[in-house]
Regions:
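Cleavable N-terminal export/targeting peptides
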Residues: 1-24
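Short glycine/proline- and aromatic-enriched beta-strand/turn motifs that initiate or cap beta-hairpins
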Residues: 19-87
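Membrane-embedded beta-strand positions of outer-membrane beta-barrel proteins
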Residues: 25-29, 69, 81-83, 119, ...
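Transmembrane beta-strands of outer-membrane beta-barrel pores
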Residues: 29-35, 85-89, 123, 138-144, ...
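Outer-membrane beta-barrel "beta-signal"
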Residues: 31, 234-246
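Flexible, solvent-exposed loop segments that connect beta-strands
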Residues: 37-57, 89-110, 140-156, 188, ...
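Gram-negative (and chloroplast) outer-membrane scaffold detector with strong preference
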Residues: 70-149, 158-176, 203-205
Length: 246
């Protein structure tokens, strides 16, 4: 009986090792069709707009590029790494005092370049076709605001830490995967989140490098409520892209 139990344990460990990837690299690039909405009311003149007044989004769609890469390694103590980039474009109007100059419905452009640095751990690694990752996202946002009517331009960089959760399910006997990830932080009054859900299809005719297609929906929300700033801005829409798995 002892030999049988030992054999079963060894077989289970070997099966788990066979199902888990010791090392893996994945990357993707595509376009996100963004629909912005909301407004920003502030008396904080130290921000990117240096504004005592209100900015309101014109809610005009735009297509912006995104890129991501996932690096998984076999060292248990060290976290795996996921890196992401996306740009966000928002056009609207500003009313108030900007850098000491009074404006009314002044056309305003805000561009945000986002770099996400995500160390994470595999809690489940394709165990029963399910993957679960937990980690921390450091979202670096480089913002630039431009009001052409008063020849005003300003930029700012902030870092937002968020909890990162990703789950994935491989549909058996197909090359289809369903995946979602959430980046989230709140202090009760203010909340920031970045949520994605997608379906992808892997083309497995190449053994070493496997191309894939992904289609999904993404929503970012910035709901800030403090003494001098009330922000309610949202960016959402469908995205699609190409992937490579090594």
């Amino acid at each position: 009986m002892k030999k049988i139990l030992t054999s079963l344990v060894c077989m289970t460990m070997l099966a788990a090792t066979a199902n888990a990837d010791l090392a893996r690299v994945e990357m993707g690039v595509g376009s996100w069709q963004q629909t912005p909405s909301g407004s920003l009311e502030t008396s904080d003149t130290s921000g990117v707009l240096s504004l005592d007044g209100t900015y309101t989004s014109a809610e005009e769609d735009s297509s912006e590029m995104y890129f991501w890469v996932l690096i998984k390694h076999p060292i248990p103590v060290l976290p795996n790494v996921r890196l992401e980039y996306v740009s966000i474009a928002d056009e609207g109007t500003t009313t108030g005092i900007v850098n000491g100059i009074g404006v009314t419905d002044a056309e305003t452009t805000i561009d945000m370049k986002q770099f996400d640095i995500i160390p994470y751990y595999n809690i489940l690694d394709n165990t029963g076709w399910v993957t679960l990752d937990l980690g921390l996202d450091l979202k670096v946002i480089q913002s630039e605001a431009d009001i052409s009517s008063i020849h005003y331009s300003s930029d700012d960089t902030i870092v937002i830490p968020l909890i990162y959760v990703r789950t994935r399910v491989e549909i058996p006997a197909t090359n289809i995967g369903v995946e979602a990830d959430v980046k989230y932080i709140t202090d009760g009054d203010s909340t920031v989140y970045d949520i994605r859900a997608k379906v992808d299809y892997t083309l497995d005719f190449i053994p070493v490098i496997q191309p894939a297609l992904e289609v999904g929906y993404r929503i970012q929300k910035y709901d800030i409520d403090d003494s001098d700033t009330k922000m309610d801005l949202e960016y959402s829409g469908v995205y699609a892209g190409l992937m490579l798995r090594f």
